[in-house]
Amino acid sequence: MKSVILTGLLFVLLCVDHMSSANQSVVATQLIPINTALTLVMMTTRVIYPTGIPAEDIPRLVSMQVNQAVPMGTTLMPDMVKFYCLCAPKN
């Protein structure tokens, strides 16, 4: 039960932190193997070039799968994530 509460708190804190960071892109914090479902632990944000998926989309990315291996430190691009689209409505 404690781990569920801590996970939820971490999710809220990360979402608030990432939503307040403008002009940042999502970056892999570890090697993400092909067909892996994304979790918050696998992603961070940075002001980086090339510009990739915006930081505010992290909540949408959770549980989406990558369609290729993503090395640690790599900017996540829209074509790397299955079913991700920049034009999709944001909740």
UniProtKB/Swiss-Prot annotation:
Contributes to protect fish blood from freezing at subzero sea water temperatures. Lowers the blood freezing point. Binds to nascent ice crystals and prevents further growth. Belongs to the type-III AFP family. The record marks Q30, N35, T39, Q65 as: Important for ice-binding. GO terms for cellular component: extracellular region. It comes from the Eukaryota. It comes from Zoarces americanus. This is Ice-structuring protein lambda OP-3. Keywords: Antifreeze protein, Secreted, Signal. Residues 1-22 form the signal peptide. Residues 25-84 form the AFP-like domain. It is found in: Secreted.
